[in-house]
């Protein structure tokens, strides 16, 4: 009888394999990086220098992934995670390392990935931008599940849709963390508990805000219960159904958030993007002003400007600043806010920044550019951006791999990486943000 090769059984055999590893670094996603038989293996939950027995969970031609079965040696700085939910909650990945060690490892990962993908080394490393280690997050989404007569509020488990029930969160701003248990107690007895999709919690200048994602219309007794809760706790309660409304069914007025030093506050609505770490965001804005050094008479572009986080702060620094955003509603909100504040030197324009260069007059004679793209970076922007020949390009990156790829394009167009700095926006997580300043000059062009 013929015997046929089974790729599936071979793969299963390899995935059951147990091996011993000692990683040498963390990558930019917070995974330990080790080598086994010439192949790179990524292992969450380990620190460089620790030894562990692991099991492969994915085995590709060029790399593998593994899970820890047992640590056989610990890093001298390893600590017990302070949060009791850490082992199950997917929100944090690095609580077993002190924040100082986390930052050192993140900076090493940032340097490695930028150098690898762009061929660039910064002329100057900036000091990391830091904020509080705990209670820094001013926005979060709580998942809701009604199961066996019980309402569960919590965060998703790592790599899963399952919820981990929590009663507090040490990285969430205290006014928001303190609402978790009372919200569970408020909603659980109500019939609407079965119809809540999630809760969005945010801390605005106006105070705490809770948005209830409701999958059916709100009933009068439920409205009264939510209103009483909001009034007693100083919380603005909103409903997200087919539209975002207050409890009376009216449209919601824009909220605001502080960007420090008496600067004009951007306006936003729940659902808009804004930086979740207020202290570090203010530090980023101050560093942007310091690095760009906008001068009277200059013209600047703020690409991917959102509601004007940087644009409003830069108001008055240059003769003309143009914020460019691809979400029409946010453009309209930013325009209205600038008009409300009387900031005539600011303009906000809509443009699809993932495609060809906009054919617009405002692209001419640009002196400096700030861009703050999403994790995918700005591949559609880099070629035409470099052709504008601004004297300073400040790239705010939430993904170092995108920064490295986009930085390579700038390098090929004759820009050098003059400054690079870590931005520790999310302590205890694998998220790694950075700021990079590119200026014209001699540079080793990547091949």
UniProtKB/Swiss-Prot annotation:
The keyword 4Fe-4S applies. Its EC number is 2.1.1.190. It is an enzyme of class 2 (transferase). GO terms for biological process: rRNA base methylation. Keywords: 4Fe-4S, Iron, Iron-sulfur, Metal-binding, Methyltransferase, rRNA processing, S-adenosyl-L-methionine, Transferase. Gene3D superfamilies: 2.40.50.1070, Nucleic acid-binding proteins (2.40.50.140), Vaccinia Virus protein VP39 (3.40.50.150). [4Fe-4S] cluster binds at residues 83, 89, 92, 169. The active site is at residue 398. Residues 12-70 form the TRAM domain. One of its GO terms (molecular function) is RNA binding. S-adenosyl-L-methionine binds at residues 275, 304, 309, 325, 352, 372. It catalyses: uridine(1939) in 23S rRNA + S-adenosyl-L-methionine = 5-methyluridine(1939) in 23S rRNA + S-adenosyl-L-homocysteine + H(+). Belongs to the class I-like SAM-binding methyltransferase superfamily. RNA M5U methyltransferase family. RlmD subfamily. Catalyzes the formation of 5-methyl-uridine at position 1939 (m5U1939) in 23S rRNA. HAMAP family: 23SrRNA_methyltr_RlmD. This is 23S rRNA (uracil(1939)-C(5))-methyltransferase RlmD. The lineage of its organism: Bacteria, Pseudomonadati, Pseudomonadota, Gammaproteobacteria, Alteromonadales.
